[in-house]
Amino acid sequence: MAMTILASILLAASAQALPPATALPPPVTDAATVLAPINAVFAAFEAGDAPAVLRHVYPEGRVTATGTRASGSGLRHQSWTQFAERLKPGDGFQERISDPAIEIDGDVAMVWAPFVVRVGGKVSNCGYDHFDLVRDNGTWKIMNLTFSSRTAGCPAQ
């Protein structure tokens, strides 16, 4: 009896709680295919090519930006068409993301990444991009983009 109790105590003492489960990183090929429309949209931003942006997004999607504005609220919503209409060729706009976190579940994906925007080679603003994407007929497209934006504390300022 004493041996059974001792064995039970030792077994309980040696048991450890498992760490929380974390998702496995997506296979490299899946990550690359999810990032492809994002990279294409950034290239279209740089070229000021609104039609190219619209080829990689769902028209019913939205762009939502947060950040402090002089006028008060920093929350802005636009359709992809409204957002793309603001692009101008040759304005020197360049956006880069780094260290994207990519989550994929079937035909839905999410990309979260810090970004820096340069205009004419100078840092303009930075923040975080959150893209949600949907795959239809084997093609990933961006449904929505939500991003934060600040002008201070940006890398390389």
Where would I find each of the regions flagged by the language model?
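Bacterial N-terminal signal peptides
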Residues: 2-14
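Surface-exposed, charged secondary-structure patches
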Residues: 18, 74-124
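General beta-strand recognition
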Residues: 52, 62-64, 110, 141
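Short, solvent-exposed secondary-structure junction/capping segments
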Residues: 39-43, 55-70
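Short, low-complexity N-terminal intrinsically disordered segments enriched in polar/charged residues
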Residues: 16-55
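Extracytoplasmic
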Residues: 48, 58, 97, 106-108, ...
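Short beta-strand segments enriched in hydrophobic/aromatic residues
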Residues: 57, 115-117, 146-148
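Short beta-strand edge/turn micro-motifs at domain boundaries
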Residues: 110, 126-153
